[in-house]
C-alpha cells in the first residue's frame, strides 16, 4: 500500500483539535493551514537535491537546491483550497492548478465541472491536496486528468483517509503515494469518513451542509 501516515506529535495534536464537534470556522481554517504545511513537509521529504555555487557573503560557496522538476499544487475544489496556503508556505514558487469536482450524493461518484492546469505538466511534480479521501473517486479522477495531461510525478496530501478510498486509489494508481495524518475506521452509508472531520468543505467555508 503506497500510504504514509504521518505520526509526528504536532500532526496528531492538530488533527485531534480538528475533530472537535463544535469547532469554529476560524479555528478549523487555521489548523487546516497548519496541518497542510506539516503534511507537505513530509510529502516533499525525498525531493532530490543538487549542488550549485553561489556568491556568499565571504565568497563562492556551494549550496543545495531542489533538482529538476518544479512543483504544481493541485487543490480539488472547493475544500482543497483550505490547504493551499499551508502548502505554499513551503513551496511559495509553486504554480497552481485546480480541479473542480463534486460528489453525486446518490451514487457517491465524482462529477467534474472545471479544471485548469499549468503548462509543462510533464516537467512538474504535482501535489494534489484535499482534506478528505473518502471513497477515492475524486482523487482517482484528478490523477486521471493529470496523467492525461502528461504529468508523471504525482503525490496526494490529505488530512484524513478512509481504508475504502485508499484501496481504490492504490488499485487505480499504485504509483501515486498518499500522505495523511490518519487512516480512519471506515465510511458510513452516506460515504462520510468515520470518525472523520464531518464536512471539511462546509467547515472551511462556513456553510451549512444540506
From Swiss-Prot:
Uracil binds at residues 193, 198-200. It comes from the Bacteria. Binds 1 Mg(2+) ion per subunit. The magnesium is bound as Mg-PRPP. Its cofactor is Mg(2+). Pathway: Pyrimidine metabolism; UMP biosynthesis via salvage pathway; UMP from uracil: step 1/1. Its EC number is 2.4.2.9. InterPro entries: PRibTrfase_dom (IPR000836), PRTase-like (IPR029057), Upp_B (IPR034332), UPRTase/APRTase (IPR050054), Ura_phspho_trans (IPR005765). 5-phospho-alpha-D-ribose 1-diphosphate binds at residues 78, 103, 130-138, 199. GO terms for molecular function: GTP binding; magnesium ion binding; uracil phosphoribosyltransferase activity. GO terms for biological process: UMP salvage; uracil salvage. CDD domains: PRTases_typeI. Allosterically activated by GTP. It is an enzyme of class 2 (transferase). It catalyses: UMP + diphosphate = 5-phospho-alpha-D-ribose 1-diphosphate + uracil. Keywords: Allosteric enzyme, Glycosyltransferase, GTP-binding, Magnesium, Nucleotide-binding, Transferase. Belongs to the UPRTase family. Catalyzes the conversion of uracil and 5-phospho-alpha-D-ribose 1-diphosphate (PRPP) to UMP and diphosphate. This is Uracil phosphoribosyltransferase. It comes from Laribacter hongkongensis (strain HLHK9).
Amino acid at each position: 500500500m503506497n500510504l504514509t501516515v504521518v505520526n509526528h506529535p504536532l500532526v496528531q495534536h492538530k488533527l485531534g483539535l480538528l475533530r472537535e464537534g463544535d469547532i469554529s470556522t476560524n479555528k478549523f481554517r487555521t489548523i487546516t493551514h497548519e496541518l497542510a504545511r506539516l503534511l507537505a513537509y513530509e510529502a516533499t521529504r525525498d525531493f532530490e537535491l543538487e549542488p550549485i555555487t553561489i556568491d556568499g557573503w565571504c565568497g563562492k560557496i556551494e549550496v543545495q537546491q531542489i533538482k529538476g522538476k518544479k512543483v504544481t499544487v493541485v487543490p480539488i475544489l472547493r475544500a482543497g483550497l483550505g490547504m493551499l496556503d499551508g502548502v505554499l508556505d513551503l513551496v511559495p514558487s509553486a504554480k497552481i492548478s485546480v480541479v473542480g469536482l463534486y460528489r453525486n450524493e446518490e451514487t457517491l461518484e465524482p462529477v467534474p465541472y472545471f479544471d485548469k492546469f499549468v503548462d509543462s505538466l510533464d516537467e512538474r511534480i504535482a501535489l494534489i491536496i484535499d482534506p478528505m479521501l473518502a471513497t477515492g473517486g475524486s482523487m482517482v479522477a484528478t490523477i486521471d486528468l493529470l496523467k492525461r495531461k502528461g504529468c508523471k510525478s504525482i503525490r496526494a496530501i490529505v488530512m484524513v483517509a478512509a481504508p475504502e478510498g485508499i484501496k481504490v486509489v492504490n488499485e487505480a494508481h499504485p504509483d501515486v503515494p498518499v500522505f495523511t495524518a490518519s487512516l480512519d475506521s471506515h465510511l458510513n452509508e452516506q460515504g462520510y469518513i468515520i470518525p472523520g472531520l464531518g464536512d471539511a468543505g462546509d467547515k472551511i467555508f462556513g456553510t451549512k451542509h444540506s
